[in-house]
Amino acid sequence: INCSSSELSNRNLFDELMAIINSNNIMPEHIRLELTESAMFDDFNMVIHNMEKLNESGIKFYLDDFGTGYSNLERIIGCPFNTIKFDKTLLYKSLDNSAVSDIVSHLTSVFKEQGFVLLIEGVENEEQASYSIDKGFDYIQGYKYAKPQPVINLKDYFDKLERAIS
């Protein structure tokens, strides 16, 4: 679920979100909230407060589009993120520029040492997939594997996927 800066700065976010979760019998551990680096700059203290409370309830946080915003590593490491989603622009630039590729290698190493799960977005072909695996990403996302699906199509999509695996 994508979160905006105004949602994350809402003093009532925890209570409102937990009411929705509880009324729909959803386990908080199944919820993933995505936010971009820029979403953290409205009211940083309130954003961190909300993230910590939600994280304690079991909700996980993904930092989306890493590498395209302000990339303040001190703030990122000080926030309760579980997963860092590297933006596709880093992937594309890495394949054409060895300096960018080296930076991605170092970043993945540092984030892994800190216990983050790493995901890369925008993988569209085998070269990009191989590169992402070689760099140590835990998850790969992109059109090579699946295109975004309307909710109404998800059951059919997963049924086909299950048949293909069986």
Task: State where each predicted segment sits.
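Short helix-capping segments at alpha-helix termini
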Residues: 23-28, 54-57
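A short, hydrophobic coiled-coil helix within the histidine kinase transmitter core
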Residues: 16-20
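EAL-family c-di-GMP phosphodiesterase catalytic domain
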Residues: 4-11, 30-44, 57-166
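Conserved functional hotspot residues or short segments at active or partner-binding sites
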Residues: 50
